[in-house]
């Protein structure tokens, strides 16, 4: 199949990488696994055995007229432990490489179908100036965009760093969430070739 290149001749690309069917279930699984992997998982609260004190019973068992109490650190008490206290846990979800690559192929194919993938010969800025990048993106009619190149250009990265709806990634740094989070994905021809190598 062919991909149109902005201001240049169309290029021949792999049908498998850029023209496959959209597998919503697989993409959802990849996104959930990616987001789960980003969770810190260090949240911890104290249950009744973790809080200090509460060893001595507050009052004797019988004769006070009050309800019996064996500790002052139960969940019903002020200063007591939490009933179902959160514990540190690992939220990682296993996703096979084959499934992950298939999800990326599915996303790229859907971006092409929705005309959200903008291919350019090359994309760079002369100096790390946000103004020049905004001007360049404006010329292409882009504002909410992920820029993917085969290798991250330092000037481009610094110029985009202060823009809230612009991100710069290389091919290896692209993930399912970033690829679907933006209105458009601006990708260079070398990056397209690299995606084909990795996912083909």
UniProtKB/Swiss-Prot annotation:
<keyword id="KW-0689">Ribosomal protein</keyword>
<dbReference type="Pfam" id="PF00573">
    <property type="entry name" value="Ribosomal_L4"/>
</dbReference>
<comment type="similarity">
    <text>Belongs to the universal ribosomal protein uL4 family.</text>
</comment>
<dbReference type="InterPro" id="IPR023574">
    <property type="entry name" value="Ribosomal_uL4_dom_sf"/>
</dbReference>
<dbReference type="GO" id="GO:0003735">
    <property type="term" value="F:structural constituent of ribosome"/>
</dbReference>
<keyword id="KW-0694">RNA-binding</keyword>
<dbReference type="GO" id="GO:0019843">
    <property type="term" value="F:rRNA binding"/>
</dbReference>
<keyword id="KW-0699">rRNA-binding</keyword>
<dbReference type="GO" id="GO:0006412">
    <property type="term" value="P:translation"/>
</dbReference>
<dbReference type="GO" id="GO:1990904">
    <property type="term" value="C:ribonucleoprotein complex"/>
</dbReference>
<dbReference type="GO" id="GO:0005840">
    <property type="term" value="C:ribosome"/>
</dbReference>
<protein>
    <recommendedName>
        <fullName>Large ribosomal subunit protein uL4</fullName>
    </recommendedName>
</protein>
<comment type="function">
    <text>Forms part of the polypeptide exit tunnel.</text>
</comment>
<comment type="function">
    <text>One of the primary rRNA binding proteins, this protein initially binds near the 5'-end of the 23S rRNA. It is important during the early stages of 50S assembly. It makes multiple contacts with different domains of the 23S rRNA in the assembled 50S subunit and ribosome.</text>
</comment>
<feature type="region of interest" description="Disordered">
    <location>
        <begin position="38"/>
        <end position="75"/>
    </location>
</feature>
<keyword id="KW-0687">Ribonucleoprotein</keyword>
<dbReference type="InterPro" id="IPR002136">
    <property type="entry name" value="Ribosomal_uL4"/>
</dbReference>
<comment type="subunit">
    <text>Part of the 50S ribosomal subunit.</text>
</comment>
<dbReference type="InterPro" id="IPR013005">
    <property type="entry name" value="Ribosomal_uL4-like"/>
</dbReference>
């Amino acid at each position: 199949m062919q991909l149109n290149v902005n201001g240049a001749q169309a290029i021949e690309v792999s049908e498998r990488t850029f023209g496959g069917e959209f597998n919503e279930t697989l993409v959802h699984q990849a996104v959930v696994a990616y987001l789960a992997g980003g969770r810190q998982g260090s949240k911890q609260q104290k249950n009744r055995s973790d809080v200090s004190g509460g060893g001595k019973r507050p009052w004797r068992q019988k004769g006070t007229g009050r309800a019996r109490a064996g500790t002052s650190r139960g969940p019903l008490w002020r200063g007591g432990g939490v009933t179902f206290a959160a514990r540190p846990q690992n939220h990682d979800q296993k996703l096979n490489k084959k499934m992950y690559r298939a999800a990326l192929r599915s996303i790229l194919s859907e971006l092409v179908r929705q005309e959200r993938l903008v291919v350019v010969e090359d994309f760079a800025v002369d100096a790390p100036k946000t103004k020049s990048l905004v001007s360049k993106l404006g010329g292409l009619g882009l504002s909410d965009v992920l820029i993917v190149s085969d290798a991250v250009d330092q000037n481009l990265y610094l110029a985009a760093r202060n823009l809230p709806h612009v991100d710069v990634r290389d091919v290896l740094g692209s993930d399912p969430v970033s690829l679907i989070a933006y209105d458009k994905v601006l990708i260079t021809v070398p990056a397209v070739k690299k995606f084909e190598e990795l996912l083909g």
